[in-house]
């Protein structure tokens, strides 16, 4: 018998979690796949970046067809790939380690590698490939791409950001002229999912205690969500891309990426909240919320309708026993009013 109760169309609540919805002080949102559909922006950027880099490294136009939606989804479901440049790096590394110039063979190998990934992200992939006799490929990829590394020093980080942001935003973001893209960016293909009505409704429910915890930069969030951000506390929001750059530049020993609890805890502290509902679409969002839940009452609500494979995403949420599942972030007010009665 299912432990999930359907309280409305496309809204399911874990019966064991119903009591957790009482007295939630704030709402903290993931952006990509939750507030914004990124299938034609970030996902497309991964595919182009990987093709571009492999063409430079080993030649051939076939590499633009390497990355499939299935491959991206498998990596994201591992819980360690909130950063899409990490995803691009893993796809490139897997293609190199496959030892084949046949794109189908390389893709199948990459899909196999994705099954070995876990919440440790690229570290888990590098360790698996090294142990399986592909240490030379790992060294080559790290050296050729200088990754992980900042834009300007790592060619992979630079290419990804140029393709995603486009000429003008890249210049604004990094204060350097682009070298690989003199046109618009994939960010222009972002599709905002959350409606103005939903944002206003939630802002009233939480008395304006709403923030965003996203792998994006603040610039990218502001560019896509525009005036809608007035209803979020941006001072309490955490933009992990920006935070990570500070960590790398200052050689700090802090892990800020999801699924580490750092960003969610920092946002809650800034909102002066001791309980939260976290809304996201990925495995790392679940893991992060549960880590925070060890200290503070935290509810996780999974959003499945804007991803690559909504059925697979819904199943993942059920398999991981999340507190609530909604097809679309605009159903969140209905969920909350049904559970806090």
Predicted regions and their residues:
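Non-catalytic pre-domain segments flanking phosphatase-related domains
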Residues: 1-29, 65, 77, 101-155, ...
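Active-site neighborhood of HAD-like aspartate-dependent phosphohydrolases
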Residues: 3-70, 86-89
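Glycine-rich phosphate-binding loop signature in dinucleotide/nucleotide-binding domains
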Residues: 21, 205-208, 270-274, 293, ...
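Substrate-recognition element of Asp-dependent hydrolases with the DxDx(T/V) motif
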Residues: 34-35, 39, 46, 147-153, ...
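Extended charged low-complexity segments that act as oligomerization/scaffolding linkers
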Residues: 55-103, 239-245, 313
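Structural recognition of alpha->loop->beta junctions
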Residues: 79-80, 230-248, 312-336
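Substrate-recognition "cap/lid" segment bordering the active-site pocket of phosphatases
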Residues: 181-192, 211, 215-277, 283-294
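Acidic, Mg2+-coordinating phosphoryl-transfer loop and its flanking beta/alpha structural elements
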Residues: 226, 278-325
